[in-house]
Amino acid sequence: MSVQYSLSPQFMLLSNITQFSPIFYLTSFPGLEGIKHWIFIPFFFMYMVAISGNCFILIIIKTNPRLHTPMYYLLSLLALTDLGLCVSTLPTTMGIFWFNSHSIYFGACQIQMFCIHSFSFMESSVLLMMSFDRLVAICHPLRYSVIITGQQVVRAGLIVIFRGPVATIPIVLLLKAFPYCGSVVLSHSFCLHQEVIQLACTDITFNNLYGLMVVVFTVMLDLVLIALSYGLILHTVAGLASQEEQRRAFQTCTAPLCAVLVFFVPMMGLSLVHRFGKHAPPAIHLLMANVYLFVPPMLNPIIYSIKTKEIHRAIIKFLGLKKASK
């Protein structure tokens, strides 16, 4: 049963007139408008955990000189990326749930889309860097301090920062050239390229091919290299002499490996739904998009706080607990 949206005549007229710069209507959770304030409670909780958790990780690393090492510089970059990804969706989500503001101008939609996809590509790159860091630390421990230096991390970080936006800019700019003369309803709380491009009333083959190429040569390539890195790590760990050495080596990889799973599993699920689930209910698309954008920023600080001993000890010390002295 389709859901009807009561758009105002002014909204519809303005959307039809501004064919090349439409105003989109974000539905959020269609059919559940009556309980939207209750729906916002888990979203607000995830926002608070994600923002406070990642800020806390940054403060812990900043205030603890022992954590001023390449591994934790990469963790800081991951926390910053998670903050950016989380904050990118905040304006429209807050506007819908608290101010009943569902409309978004095309320019604002482009900016939000640019931020979401840029930070997604950046997070993929950071996870690749972290896997390479663990690969060198376990497979070549004696050369770690030579290969992985603070200067190398800064250079790699700059590449990561520019890689995401450079890959995203053409996707976003190409949307400006398309007319949008049909429906202007987006079944999300935010703008995603896969959803916006479907509203264009012209041939979008080139845009789809370019978007697929970008995903293959960024996210998918990163995933393959990450899998190879952890495959080599597991091979090296399996060859260690004692079980205690194997356990210690594997423990250093637990947190970054969990971060990889938390990020890539929802992303692959969302991609499969968009590519092959065109007839799936809108709620499925919406659920997968929210899991992909909200869960990694929320869980990453928790994972590193629990699974990384140095972070755990630094948190205890920062909070002034007695265990810090042990």
UniProtKB/Swiss-Prot annotation:
Presence of keyword Secreted: no
Its biological purpose: Odorant receptor.
One Gene Ontology cellular component: plasma membrane
GO molecular function, one term: G protein-coupled receptor activity
Protein name: Olfactory receptor 51M1
Principal location listed in the UniProt entry: membrane
Signal sequence interval, chain numbering: none
Originating species: Homo sapiens
Locations listed in the record: Cell membrane
S-S bridge residues: C109-C201
Protein origin, superkingdom: Eukaryota
Segments on the Extracellular side according to the record's topology features: 1-40, 98-110, 187-213, 274-282
Keyword Heme: no
Transmembrane intervals: 41-61, 77-97, 111-131, 166-186, 214-234, 253-273, 283-303
Any single GO BP term: sensory perception of smell
Gene name as annotated: OR51M1
One protein family per Pfam: 7tm_4
Cross-referenced CDD domains: 7tmA_OR51-like
Sites where a glycan is attached: N16
Similarity remark: Belongs to the G-protein coupled receptor 1 family.
Segments on the Cytoplasmic side according to the record's topology features: 62-76, 132-165, 235-252, 304-326
Keyword line: Cell membrane, Disulfide bond, G-protein coupled receptor, Glycoprotein, Membrane, Olfaction, Receptor, Sensory transduction, Transducer, Transmembrane, Transmembrane helix
UniProt membrane topology term: Multi-pass membrane protein
